[in-house]
Amino acid sequence: MATTSLDLAKVRNIGIMAHIDAGKTTTTERILFYTGVSYKIGEVHDGAATMDWMEQEQERGITITSAATTCHWPLEDNDYTINIIDTPGHVDFTVEVERSLRVLDGAVTVFDGVAGVEPQSETVWRQADRYGVPRICFVNKLDRTGAEFHRCVDMIKDRLGAVPIIMQLPIGAEMDFKGVVDLVRMKALVWSAEAAKGEMYDVVDIPATHAEAAEEYRGKLVETVAENDDEIMELFLEGQEPTEEQLYAAIRRITIASGKGDGVTVTPVFCGTAFKNKGVQPLLDAVVRYLPTPLDVEAIEGHDVKDPEVVVKRKPSEDEPLSALAFKIMSDPHLGKLTFVRVYSGRLESGTAVLNSVKGKKERIGKIYRMHANKREEIEAVGAGDIVAVMGLKQTTTGETLSDDKNPVILESMDFPAPVIQVAIEPKSKGDQEKLGVAIQRLAEEDPSFQVHSDEETGQTIIGGMGELHLEVLVDRMRREFKVEANVGKPQVAYRETIRKTVERVDYTHKKQTGGTGQFAKVQIAIEPITETDGPAYEFVNKVTGGRIPREYIPSVDAGAQEAMQFGILAGYEMTGVRVTLLDGAYHEVDSSELAFKIAGSQAFKEAARKASPVLLEPMMAVEVTTPEESMGDVIGDLNSRRGQIQAMEERSGARVVKGLVPLSEMFGYVGDLRSKTSGRASYSMQFDSYAEVPRNVAEEIIAKAKGE
């Protein structure tokens, strides 16, 4: 059995990011085919793609789970290991994307050559900016009617604010697309019609028809590189032409550096058509040439277990103590629970004990696997910089840190958004009851954006997620993987409540002093709205002095206020954006207790919230509709009728794009209405934007319904 200490300079941990349908899974499939892992090319069209291994993904033709796959690629006499994290492109699964980005060193962003930069492309681009992930771009589908390489490059510049370095020019357009001009080597790469799977291509002189454009764009390439790299700038100013090697090295430096700073992202752009097997091998060369190794990435930062203020750094070396992040949990039908782990420092060995430093619990490492999309290879140990799947972790959930128990560290935790949509779910029979509990527990372990609670009044189980598709897929998985038959209610919007006014003082005394052990707690609190846009959902400030309330009771007041926030004043929805200040209080030597102060905190909060002008908030979705011009009036009218606010309109490749903010509650069933209004020619995407106050007339209806009036 293999034990692996890879040469980290020859490792690339990459993700492939894109908008749904840009051809991301097809591109990944081709990469796996050309790197020799997959002997048959899996097509998304016929549901056979290797990465899309969950049944629902194969039916829907979209990628839901980021499966980690290891493959190998030779370049210039070296063999490189590429770990690919396949990320979903549908907005309901942005949590998966965030989680994958956290463990990547670099990424390939795939764009649809016809549609260009689409809404979800912007979302994942911004997420990659936030995590400082260096990127290269691949403009795909150049064989399609309406594909325009240069328009797509302009959109990368204008809509993403990036600086593209055009590395290739297409040879031929649409159906006649047959290869690319390599602007560094100044050669043409042409795929012959005979090699149906595109495994062979010829490196030839640039055709005369493309010579002038090649010269022009080669000049632009050198200029862009010079503007971003001092070494090439010196050559440029001296009038010297850089060599291939100098350009490769400079583009690598620029690509890696642009992920680190807060400056503009500079990104090499390649092109091809994955479906027609053209342009994928040069893309693999580019992954190796330009994307960072684990050694290029700065030391991972975490914090001390006892003191979150103390920063702890770990270099990507096997000599450092172990630090690893669990970024994905999956249920394998044969192996049970698998935890996908990125090792940042030290070594992870099968059969050893490690510490889950978030929970303070010891875990035993079972078998370690290198995963292909749906096949596996067992290894004994794994070193820094690698990504593997581990068996045997019982307590570890997504986003938690595994470390050496003598040198514990907590790596930066991931914050996941609260669900915006909920449905009630109940088992069809007694036999399904237990299975439903197991299914929900497993799915919640795998997916932190999937949340579960019981409705105290109805006793129903409520599940929440990031959108209708997200919940559909989860319910579908319950049925297929856990054999649970369940009735699912209508989707409900996750409203919130907040306050608009500051209440400077509310006194509350909790007293029960008749017979038996008494209870006594007196608190005085103030509450105010948290107005900062990125402020916390809740904040507790303690201003009690002189021991008026003993220190051990203060957290109970905080806990009581937080408990009261779970069920708002108006309609019982969770409250958000409230700062509670504990000003004063009193206690009794015998009768005071943690429980008494918790009750006092809870009741004082409720009283204060009633006086603080409570309002209802609703999730607003950023909606983008692409429609033929003749249907534009109908589309805008329809969005207005749904209480939408139109924010922008633009033209994109012959169609009109309408952007707006629309309440989620008004968007149920929108796909059918849009189809009928535009004869099926329009498409839309939406994602959560923010919470906004509900207009009074609508709020009154929601409140009345919640109270059962």
From Swiss-Prot:
Record's function text: Catalyzes the GTP-dependent ribosomal translocation step during translation elongation. During this step, the ribosome changes from the pre-translocational (PRE) to the post-translocational (POST) state as the newly formed A-site-bound peptidyl-tRNA and P-site-bound deacylated tRNA move to the P and E sites, respectively. Catalyzes the coordinated movement of the two tRNA molecules, the mRNA and conformational changes in the ribosome.
Source organism: Streptomyces avermitilis (strain ATCC 31267 / DSM 46492 / JCM 5070 / NBRC 14893 / NCIMB 12804 / NRRL 8165 / MA-4680)
Subcellular location as annotated: Cytoplasm
UniProtKB keywords: Cytoplasm, Elongation factor, GTP-binding, Nucleotide-binding, Protein biosynthesis
HAMAP family given in the database record: EF_G_EF_2_B (MF_00054_B)
Pfam families per UniProt: EF-G_D2, EFG_C, EFG_III, EFG_IV, GTP_EFTU
Molecular-function annotations in GO: GTP binding; GTPase activity; translation elongation factor activity
Domain tr-type G: 9-295
Family, as annotated: Belongs to the TRAFAC class translation factor GTPase superfamily. Classic translation factor GTPase family. EF-G/EF-2 subfamily.
InterPro entries for the chain: EF-G-like_DII, EFG_II, EFG_III, EFG_III/V, EFG_IV, EFG_V, EFG_V-like, G_TR_CS
GO cellular component term of the entry, any: cytoplasm
Keyword GTP-binding applies: yes
The name this protein goes by in its record: Elongation factor G
A biological process from GO: ribosome disassembly
Major subcellular location class: cytoplasm
Positions of GTP binding: 18-25, 86-90, 140-143
